[in-house]
Amino acid sequence: MLFYFGLAVIFLIDSSQTQTLYKVNEVGGSQVDRNLCGSDIPTAIKDICGIKKRQNIPRKYGRDPNNILEKEEFAKRFLRVRRQTTDIVEECCVENCAIEEIAEYC
């Protein structure tokens, strides 16, 4: 909940300019939040990545070494491959970007 509240604060749009934008060249046509360029890009990354880190609360009892879902070799299979063909400037300044796309650069 805190994550979405923080993101809403970051991406407030003037009510006179309210419009919904969608990415059409990607699977799913996800809603984009804002066009970010220049110094807005590192600020957004800092704010979004900081919010994500604060949500990672350490476990009370640690990891169970016998649980296959927590073994490193199994966990790495689920890692998302970062896109190599685009960078954050193209994603957010040229095409507009969604919050999830900014979070990929954390």
From Swiss-Prot:
UniProt keyword Protein biosynthesis present: no
Record carries keyword Secreted: yes
One Pfam family from the record: Insulin
Disulfide bonds: 37-93, 49-106, 92-97
Positions of the propeptide removed during maturation: 19-34, 52-82
Domain of life: Eukaryota
Function of the protein: Insulin decreases blood glucose concentration. May have evolved to activate insulin receptors (INSR) in vertebrates. Molecular docking studies reveals unique interaction with the human insulin receptor. In vivo, insulin-like peptide injection reduces blood glucose levels in two models of zebrafish diabetes (streptozotocin- and glucose-induced). Also shorter swimming distance of zebrafish larvae, an effect which is not observed with human insulin.
Family: Belongs to the insulin family.
Protein name as catalogued: Insulin-like peptide 03
